[in-house]
């Protein structure tokens, strides 16, 4: 496989499978507040098993993931965390190197979340421009990878709406519409949402489960017992556990 600095890449792996692209989106837990100082020496090295969209470089090329260097950038609300923190991408790289996804390496990754965000702020007409960025970033991957892509979206969203008091029926409907836009932008995408049992928010969890029951290609993972770094965020170990649960739900049997 050859990755080029511009243009497109020859991306058909030796196993003949489509390039596998992960998109991590939502609020601050999609960016992540796992301490890099807790990571292993291997986890702190450049990880060629995961090629992440470099949001700060011209053309947003795909480059090897490295915690503290390119894993957490252009994420509203986490600007002071860029060099010292990470999210779900760390365990994704572990899975690509020696775990359940080792036969799909390299994986491709787009991070496009924003801290403090509510579902209304992800509407295409919202002044935040969050949806426009989602489209721009995923389009940048499409331009660099030839052929049909396999998309998996991990979404962690709902805490800020619960805190803000967004009416649950309204929230559920708006999230359903948002998921529809995601699946239109990313054909065939499978979406896995995080629930928030480890933080609380029982009504939000119930609505997420209902979305997973009602919508095609949408799943959710419960997070009971997952350790936190504070009241609303998973830390180093918690992010590993959540990522492992997300991976288990990301693929149908036989894939």
What is the predicted role of each segment?
Residues 3-255:
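Cell-envelope and extracellular/periplasmic
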């Amino acid at each position: 496989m050859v990755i080029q600095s511009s243009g497109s890449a020859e991306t058909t792996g030796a196993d003949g499978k489509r390039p596998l692209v992960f998109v991590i989106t939502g609020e601050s837990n999609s960016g992540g507040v796992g301490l890099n100082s807790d990571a292993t020496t291997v986890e702190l090295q450049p990880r060629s098993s995961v090629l992440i969209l470099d949001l700060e470089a011209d053309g947003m090329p795909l480059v090897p993931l490295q915690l503290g260097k390119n894993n957490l950038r252009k994420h509203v609300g986490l600007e002071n965390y860029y060099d010292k923190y990470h999210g779900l991408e760390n365990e994704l790289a572990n899975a690509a190197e020696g775990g359940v996804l080792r036969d799909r390496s390299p994986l491709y990754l787009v991070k496009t979340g924003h801290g403090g965000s509510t579902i209304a702020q992800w509407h295409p007409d919202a002044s935040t421009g969050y949806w426009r960025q989602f489209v721009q970033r995923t389009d940048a991957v499409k331009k660099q990878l030839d052929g049909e892509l396999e998309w998996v979206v991990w979404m962690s969203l709902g805490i800020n709406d619960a805190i803000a008091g967004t009416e649950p029926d309204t929230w559920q409907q708006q999230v359903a519409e948002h998921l529809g836009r995601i699946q239109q932008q990313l054909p065939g995408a499978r979406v896995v949402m995080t629930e928030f049992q480890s933080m609380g928010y029982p009504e939000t969890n119930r609505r997420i489960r209902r979305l997973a029951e009602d919508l095609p290609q949408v799943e959710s993972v419960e997070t009971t017992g997952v350790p936190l770094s504070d009241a609303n965020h998973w830390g180093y170990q918690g992010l590993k556990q959540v990522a492992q649960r997300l991976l288990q739900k990301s693929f149908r049997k036989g894939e």
